[in-house]
């Protein structure tokens, strides 16, 4: 390109990289040469020649479920708005797989990585920080890495949901939580328990699901088979609530006339079930 345009390689580099400090006639010569030769920049070569790859990485626990699809969509949209590419991989539900996924993205010279990991230990994450790796943790709070953590006030949200049931007059309330090994699941359950304790009311039951339709259905069915069933159920995510709603319908109960149902978060499907969540 430089030879055809009659300029230096440094000038071509400035034009290709969008440097405004190039005179218009020179820029036009370079652009004509680029078009004539069909030249396209090599991102890998650029990354090797500089300290930046213009690429971000995302590690998710899984690709399954509406949450992860929405997460990837939002992250990619934001990355592209800043001229960045996005590489996505999954941890496949084990600490070793999550660690390999993280190392793989850094080996590909990602400028930074967003981690939505469930099994990777706090010590491993501190090790990454000690290695001066650029990463942000999503929905995870690690002591000593607070400045890298983007999380939510799970206890507050759960207290608000539970309080709504209490304010409606319910006293026989059950909870279907997420997997207890997840910090965020424990925090959601904590908020439910705090609201119940503040009202001096004992929960009917606190069953453990896995944030999917099947576990929500299974736990709700178990609750509804009790001799003294709950008058309200709090589900710690939308998918379990939809599964619970199916069980309620199969028991020929009406929401909210016979039993109330409330859930943490609201995804794309919540408005389309009947009654809408």
Locations of regions flagged by a protein language model:
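N-terminal helix-turn-helix DNA-binding module of bacterial transcription factors
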Residues: 1-53
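Short beta-strand scaffold positions
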Residues: 2, 115, 232-236
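Bacterial carbohydrate/catabolite-sensing allosteric modules
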Residues: 36, 74-85, 100, 106-107, ...
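Amphipathic helical "hinge" segments at domain boundaries
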Residues: 39-104, 108-112, 190-193
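Short beta->alpha connector loops
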Residues: 92-95, 116-121, 239
């Amino acid at each position: 390109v430089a030879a055809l345009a009659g300029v230096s390689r440094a000038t071509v580099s400035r034009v290709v990289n969008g440097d405004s400090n190039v005179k218009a006639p020179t820029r036009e010569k370079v652009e004509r040469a680029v078009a004539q030769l069909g030249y396209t920049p090599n991102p890998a070569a650029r990354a090797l020649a500089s300290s930046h790859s213009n690429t971000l990485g995302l590690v998710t626990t899984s690709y399954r479920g509406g949450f992860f699809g929405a997460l990837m969509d939002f992250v990619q949209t934001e990355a592209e708005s800043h001229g960045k590419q996005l590489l996505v991989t999954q941890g496949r539900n084990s600490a070793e797989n999550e660690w390999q996924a993280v190392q793989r993205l850094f080996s590909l010279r990602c400028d930074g990585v967003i981690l939505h990991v469930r099994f990777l230990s706090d010590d491993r994450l501190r090790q990454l920080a000690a290695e001066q790796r650029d990463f942000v943790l999503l929905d995870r709070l690690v002591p000593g890495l607070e400045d890298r953590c983007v999380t939510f006030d799970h206890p507050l949200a759960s207290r608000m949901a539970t309080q709504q049931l209490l304010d409606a007059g319910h006293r026989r309330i059950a909870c279907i939580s997420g997997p207890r090994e997840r910090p965020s699941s424990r925090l959601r359950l904590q908020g439910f328990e705090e609201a119940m304790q503040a009202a001096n009311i004992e929960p009917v039951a606190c069953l453990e699901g896995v944030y999917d339709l099947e576990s929500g259905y299974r736990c709700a069915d178990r609750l509804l088979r009790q001799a003294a069933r709950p008058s309200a159920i709090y589900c710690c995510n939308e998918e379990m609530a939809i599964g619970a709603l199916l069980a309620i319908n199969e028991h020929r109960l009406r929401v909210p006339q016979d039993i109330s149902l409330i859930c943490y978060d609201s995804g794309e499907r919540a408005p389309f079930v009947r009654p809408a969540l």
